[in-house]
Amino acid sequence: MNIRVIYHSSKSGNTQKLAKAVAEELGVRAERMGKDSIVFAQPVDLLFVGDGIYWAKPHRITRRFFEELDPAPIKNAAVFATYGNQFKIGDDLRTLLQGKGINVVGEPFTCKGASVGTKNQGRPDETDLQNVRAFAQQMAALVK
């Protein structure tokens, strides 16, 4: 099964922590939007997409990625995200994927991330990372 993990993460590294945990759990590499050259040369059975929330919406790099995304090679997707105060980011990412005609499996995985002005310092923590690893396995099992 061809599984890919792509994400955007700010300087805080919250979403990057989740992306690396998902990738390690599934034995693949996490690729960063806006930094890595992300090409879908072969069909993707399951694409994990991760982001944080920036001024109540996905980051502009993530939105641009979706604008340019050719959905043809992507069979299924799953969403993970971090948030400071507004937890709807998972639903926003799911909507972007579905808007491209991509099947989104399961419910988005979201957890708090360290953010200025919140009580989320130290998040995502080890429990969050264990939970996102379990999420990765569950989503992969849905598309086997």
Range-by-range predicted roles:
Residues 3-4, 10, 16-17, 21-33, ...:
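FMN-binding flavodoxin-like domain, especially the glycine-rich phosphate-binding loop
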